[in-house]
Amino acid sequence: MIATLFLRSLLFSPPSLSLLVLHRRREGELCERRRITSPIIIIIIILIPDLRRMTMTMTMNVCTHVAEVCLLLILIVGIGSVCTQAKPVLPEGIEAVKVDMLPHEGFGTAEEVYSSGIADAVVGLRRAMHAQPGVMYDEYFASETSVSTLRLMGVSESNIKTGLGVTGVVAHIGAGSLESTMRADSSVRTITLRADMDALPIHEETDVPFKSTVDGVMHACGHDAHTAMLLGAAMLLKRHESELVAMNAAVRLFFQPAEEGGAGAKALVDAGAIDGTSAAVMLHVSPEDDVGTFATMRGRTNAACFTFHVIIKGVGAHGAAPHQSKDPIAAAGAIVTGIHQIVSRTIIPTDAAVISIGYINGGKAFNVIPDEVTLGGTIRLLDVSLFDSVWQTLTLRIAGIAEAYGCSAEVINRNGEKGLNSRGEEFTIYAFPPLVNDIGIIELGEEVATKMYGEGTVDRGDTPFMGCEGTVILPLYLGYMMNDEHC
């Protein structure tokens, strides 16, 4: 029941009105609805170990429905255009797209998605958010656009909660209300659909008409697609909300900030955003799998991630007199080499680990040896129990090398570090746990993908990805992740 509920909900939803969404097209270009050319979509279904009020059978049913809905919605992204009615200024060349939000009977289909205008809306939303990206905790455009779109489709103010984790948004569609379903005694069976919203500090060099208008910031990881897809799912759910109500079930929409290193999910979880839910479905994109395939993996799928910052202090001098310095640049070079040897020389080869340096900063003049150099990076582990030994080796090695060069070094674990966004609002950085997939749910996802798209569309992988999936929801549940290249 729950399964049906959730998956169904994803694909269809009710209100009794039309939704106008701004849509951007290149002149003379039509939206190729069947041509899907984007990154893989990771569907992560997570189940709480203690499923009160639910039998395992009910849980599997819910997951089945959720998976079916997500797989269908996946087809929409990557074809798209620009935008919704939100406060930020949108790029030029935008037209309105009408979405039929009238209640719809029966299980949703791809035909419904396209004929209702939802596909065009998702395309427009995705391109709009691509053109107006925001880095972690600065996702104001995506956040405000999501809220505006939810309101337009008929989600009441009482069922939308904003400002969670600075820019995070949580909304409710189905039986009960957002407030009532967050209570422990709620009888409404609720599932969470999650999308991340943040972009990366990367300069976009494409020539697409919806390229980033924010200098040095780009949606290079597909989170614009995730957010647009979640809004598309919301439209379907609203069209079929009466079915959810009849089943005493609901879907919670979880728009997460700061997946890229800021652990925005934790801020929402701490605010109670997933209280009362029994499962969560998450999407991610990646261009590595063949178009038209779904990649699955059992067990550990994504690594845990910890970030560190190093401050190396020495004594500056003129470039012509290096003997008068305690050169922090020379020390930094040796430290980077030493760090890169930690994995190959101190960790058992069968234990997957990656330590990478992401930045080095020091000096301002070509002829002056600086007093200080900073550098930082990430530690990625499939087995979190290795962290203490890796951290100890890292800190001791950095301190020893710095001392050998006459310098000192401070190594900072950034877990719990505070920061401010562009509007002066405070946020906190946290480490990410690994993602571990539940075999039973993975098998269910494979079954659904095969049923919907045919034999040969599921690629069962066995090599974990050392990238992390920044959602703190994961350590609370069993997990399921599927990659889909339909996007």
Q: What would you call each of these model-derived segments?
A:
Residues M1-S9, S13, R24, C31-I40, ...:
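Classical eukaryotic N-terminal signal peptides for Sec-dependent ER targeting/secretion
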Residues L75-E92:
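N-terminal signal peptide
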Residues K87-H219, A228-A249:
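Acidic/His- and Gly-rich active-site-bordering loop/insert found
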Residues K87-L102, S158, A330-C487:
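Metal-dependent amide/peptide-bond hydrolase catalytic core
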Residues R126, P133, L150, G154-V155, ...:
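Structural signal for hydrophobic packing residues in well-ordered secondary-structure cores
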Residues M129, L193, H223, L268, ...:
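Divalent metal-coordination and catalytic microenvironments
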Residues V169, A199-I202, T206-M218, D224-A225, ...:
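Histidine/acidic-residue-rich, glycine-tolerant segments that coordinate divalent metal ions
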